[in-house]
Structures are given as C-alpha cells and as structure tokens.
A protein has these predicted regions:
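A sequence-level/structural motif corresponding to short, flexible coil/turn segments enriched
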Residues: 1-148
Length: 148
C-alpha cells in the first residue's frame, strides 16, 4: 500500500483464479475520503506475481513482477510503470528460456531503475541453482547486456 499525493492510497493485491490456476495483480486506487477511484487487473491468461512496488514521482508508480509464460513454461521478469489514473505508461519483459524473476525495484539517482531478482539463464546456467540477477535500466525501462 502506498500513500498518494492527495492523501489517498494505491493498494496492490493478489488475485487467484482457482479454476484456471493463474494469478493476477490487482490495483485499487482510493481517494482522500477512502472512496474507490479505480481498479485495474494486470495478468489475465498469464500468471503474474507482483513483488516490488513503489512511488517514483508525484503521480507515477513502478512495480516489479514475475510473469509466467505458458508457452515456455517458465517465468520472466516483468516491470510496469503505472500512472495515477491506472494507465500503464510502459512495461518491459526481461529474461530468457528458463526462469528469471524480479524481486525488488528501486529508482536510481539518474532516474532509471535497478531491479534485483534471480536467473537460471545467465550466470552458471544451472536451472536448479539460480543466480542473483541485477538489471539496470534507464527511465523508460531500456537496458543493455554485456558479455563476460
């Protein structure tokens, strides 16, 4: 739950679809008098688990998630920037063929983002022993990869 500039709240919660086995992330925006302003569901047919969540400006929020890809039967890191009215400003997927998960996210001094998570694609490449994974992006969520 995050306090908004107008004195309201933005609340993130998990939605479980018991019949389909997928999870979604729900967002509920409450105004200063605790009235519902809007709700949004992110996920749908692909399972998603929200992790890191924080306010990054007066009217924008950033969330790190792990997004399940049914076609690959694995997770990817998923980063979403959300406006105060519930609109998705941008979203980015990071990862490869095996499980890659985003755990936490912070805004960096240059306006970009640092994401911490785990990977089975990079590092030792062992599917059963994930490595720490750090991603640095610019303010629009773009990143570059460097080989060893």
């Amino acid at each position: 739950m995050i306090r908004t500039l107008d004195g309201g709240f933005l609340i993130r919660y998990l939605i479980e679809s018991y019949g389909e086995g997928n999870t979604s992330v729900g967002l509920l925006r409450l105004g200063p008098n605790r009235q519902e302003l809007w709700t949004k569901t992110i996920g749908g047919s692909m399972g998603i688990a929200g992790r890191g969540f924080q306010k990054v400006s007066d009217d924008e929020y950033i969330m790190s998630c792990s997004l399940f890809d049914n076609g690959k039967n694995s997770y990817n890191a998923y980063i979403i920037k959300i406006g105060d009215s519930g609109d998705i400003i941008w979203d980015k997927i990071f990862g490869g063929e095996e499980n890659d998960r985003a755990r936490s996210i912070v805004q960096t001094l240059d306006g970009g983002y640092a994401i911490a998570g785990s990977t089975c694609n990079y590092g030792n490449g062992n599917k059963l022993d994930p490595d720490l994974w750090l991603i640095k992006t610019d303010s629009e969520g773009y990143s570059r990869s460097f080989d060893d």
